[in-house]
Amino acid sequence: MADWVREAADGSLTLTLHIQPGARQTGFAGLHGEAMKIRLAAPPVDGKANAALCAFLADFCEVPKSAVTLVSGETSRAKRVRVETKTPGLAGRLRALG
């Protein structure tokens, strides 16, 4: 099992993701190598896919959008995202998707 979810000492999570923009619908699509694949309905134009990714993850993780930040991969399909949260069990819930 790939460890695409990394938990820091402060409780925040770093997610390793592979993004497929321009998909029919937004959602998790299983593991893609060492990363979780997420399909986004938003096109990869003017940062729309990045904004949609942050909004999707904020909704899934039940945190404000401001708690989700793109760490790397602004113009790439391979991205690392940080989720600042204190929600117990969130890392396990995310790992269960893959």
Curated annotation (Swiss-Prot):
<dbReference type="InterPro" id="IPR036591">
    <property type="entry name" value="YggU-like_sf"/>
</dbReference>
<comment type="similarity">
    <text>Belongs to the UPF0235 family.</text>
</comment>
<dbReference type="InterPro" id="IPR003746">
    <property type="entry name" value="DUF167"/>
</dbReference>
<dbReference type="GO" id="GO:0005737">
    <property type="term" value="C:cytoplasm"/>
</dbReference>
<protein>
    <recommendedName>
        <fullName>UPF0235 protein azo3464</fullName>
    </recommendedName>
</protein>
<dbReference type="Pfam" id="PF02594">
    <property type="entry name" value="DUF167"/>
</dbReference>
